[in-house]
Amino acid sequence: MIAKTEADFNGLKEIGRICGAIRDELVALTKVGITTKELDNRAKELFDEYGALSAPKETYNFPGYTCISVNEEIAHGIPGSRVIKEGDVVNIDVSASKDGYFADTGVSFVVGEGYPEKEKVCQVAKDAFYAGLEKAKPGSKKSGLGKAVHNLAKRNGMTVIKELTGHGIGRSIHEAPDHIFNYFSRWDDELLKDGMVIAFEPFISTKEESIIQSTTDDWTL
């Protein structure tokens, strides 16, 4: 989507604010002993309170209102009976729509304290997001974002999940550009445009660069 009007910007800001608020409340609720389903149930209540719709549920009939991935799960984890434990690495992914505008946000964090290696991965992911964001300017190459992410990961002795990417967003959950890679591709010479709306999603890993599809469901990676 290319945002052009005041209505566009206001609509995008509103749904972005809602997604961020739901994400932050779920993070605060993620304590030892709670299940991912209980977290998702609270997300449903919040969607209703804000007058928003879960994007994965409405668009893809995903079996949850949010994606909650734990430890070995990198993305699209289905909320269920899994109980959160001390030291778990949790990713909460919230995407939603309101009045025809979509937003997508997520964060990874460690439950509890005293897990420096796990905490470092989460911090590098946050740092990579901001490093890439600095390259997101009209007229710059889209590939510059991925280059910034990958370089920062390598400087910290890590790498990226190459098959998971960011994407365009705005009037639907997935729009052009179809992919915003987390590494540099010299063939990717598309330029970012003024007003282009994107969901930029660094995926950082200590070792693996590829995903494996879960054998127990069609969603979890």
Whereabouts are the PLM-identified features?
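Active-site neighborhoods and metal-handling regions in enzymes and metal-associated proteins
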Residues: 1-221
